[in-house]
């Protein structure tokens, strides 16, 4: 973005266009849509016609996926700024659908452009489908309008039109039934929350310690059973699980018993769990590491140092960085950073696994000497949320380089831009 500000699209036009045609977010559901930020890169630029032509040409072939959502969001922004070509492309795309499926792709973008008239026509078409097939599942009103219009206002207007339009009446009736079901579910959820203690007592009656110990040797038993038991068990029951772990040799049973301590706090580093943290079976080893990572013990620091120095350390073992959370010591940052910097991170998923665990360590240990680790996350991790947390730590430690502070003011993350604009 800083290049665009200083030099325009020179040398980067193809890169920016490619990012418009294919979503670049690691996970747009968590990070949010990047379309407004991308649009700002070419809005009003001399290259706008090229971008508009490419985006409009891609709309008819767009799918209900992240790339398609990104394209249609861009086209919607262009249309709202007066691009008739983009508006027509979205209209043609939506109205060409037969409305008999569960999803109306691009509906909310069309509503943002054409408002209530578009909603009325979509409701009429969906109501026609319902009248032809009473069991048909159609798109819900909330998804047709998203945030473009106020739900209650739209529902009121559709209800007013229903008296003179049988198709709209059918759609309104279906929506009323659907949202009534949601209301009943919400009430049921509240009742379930109120009955949490009753369900906990019932679970413990049905899963006493003897049943849990027996289930450890049962191939069909589920992880959830052991984790919930651990969250509810008394200390005597937890001690009995530890006793069983000390003599259990079956890896599958050991892993299940370790899951009892997933949400139960250990008061000390038990020798058997310490031993299992170096088990040959990955599942057992990982389960033990999750348990002991919440403890502070000199042995854990030494284990953590061994793990990051192991040439086999990779994104698959990134969770081992959590061993430092409560066991970090001076000099460890050098080993951690060396382990991170020798990773190839050619794959976004690998870079994310490492970046997520690394920034978690920064937020747990909160030591300024980890600034190099936070900088690695900022440079390497594709997740804007992780990069935001890295910058927050660097600011807290007064270690944010000036050039990165300048970059952050133009970052793809709304939150990071907002954070930096609060800083003088």
Role assignments for model-derived ranges:
Residues 237:
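Alpha-helix-centered segments that form part of catalytic cores
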């Amino acid at each position: 973005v800083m290049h665009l500000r200083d030099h325009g699209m020179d040398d980067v036009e193809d890169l920016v266009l490619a990012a418009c045609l294919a979503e670049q977010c690691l996970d747009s559901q968590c990070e949010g849509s990047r379309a407004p930020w991308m649009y700002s890169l070419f809005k009003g630029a001399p290259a706008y016609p090229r971008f508009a032509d490419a985006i409009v040409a891609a709309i008819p072939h767009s799918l209900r996926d992240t790339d398609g959502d990104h394209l249609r969001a861009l086209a919607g922004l262009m249309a709202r700024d007066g691009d008739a070509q983009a508006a027509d492309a979205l209209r043609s795309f939506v109205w060409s659908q037969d409305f008999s499926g569960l999803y109306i792709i691009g509906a909310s973008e069309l509503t943002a452009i054409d408002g209530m008239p578009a909603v009325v026509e979509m409701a009429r078409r969906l109501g026609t489908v319902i009248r032809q097939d009473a069991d048909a599942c159609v798109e819900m009103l909330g998804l047709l309008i998203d945030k473009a219009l106020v739900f209650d206002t739209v529902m009121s207007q559709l209800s007013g039109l229903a008296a003179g339009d049988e198709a709209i009446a059918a759609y309104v009736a279906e929506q009323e039934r659907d949202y009534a079901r949601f209301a009943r579910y919400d009430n049921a959820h509240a009742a379930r929350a109120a009955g949490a203690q009753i369900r906990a007592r019932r679970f413990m009656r049905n899963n006493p310690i003897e049943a849990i110990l027996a289930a450890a040797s049962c191939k069909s038993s589920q992880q959830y059973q052991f984790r919930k038991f651990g969250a509810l068990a008394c200390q005597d029951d937890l001690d009995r699980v530890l006793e069983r772990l000390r003599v259990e040799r079956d890896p599958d049973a050991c892993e299940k018993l370790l899951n009892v301590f997933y949400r139960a706090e250990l008061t000390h580093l038990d020798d058997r769990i310490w031993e299992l943290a170096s088990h040959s079976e990955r599942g057992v080893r990982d389960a033990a590491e999750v348990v002991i990572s919440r403890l502070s013990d000199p042995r854990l620091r030494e284990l953590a140092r061994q793990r990051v120095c192991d040439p086999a350390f990779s994104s698959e073992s990134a969770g081992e960085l959590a061993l430092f959370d409560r066991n970090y010591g001076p000099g460890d940052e050098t080993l951690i950073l060396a382990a991170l910097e020798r990773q190839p991170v050619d794959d976004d998923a690998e870079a994310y696994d490492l970046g997520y665990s690394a920034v978690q360590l920064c937020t747990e240990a909160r030591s300024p000497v980890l600034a190099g680790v936070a900088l690695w996350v900022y440079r390497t991790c594709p997740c804007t949320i992780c990069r935001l947390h890295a910058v927050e730590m660097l600011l807290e430690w007064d270690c944010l380089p000036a050039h990165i502070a300048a970059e952050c003011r133009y970052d793809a993350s709304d939150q990071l831009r907002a954070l930096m604009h609060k800083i003088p």
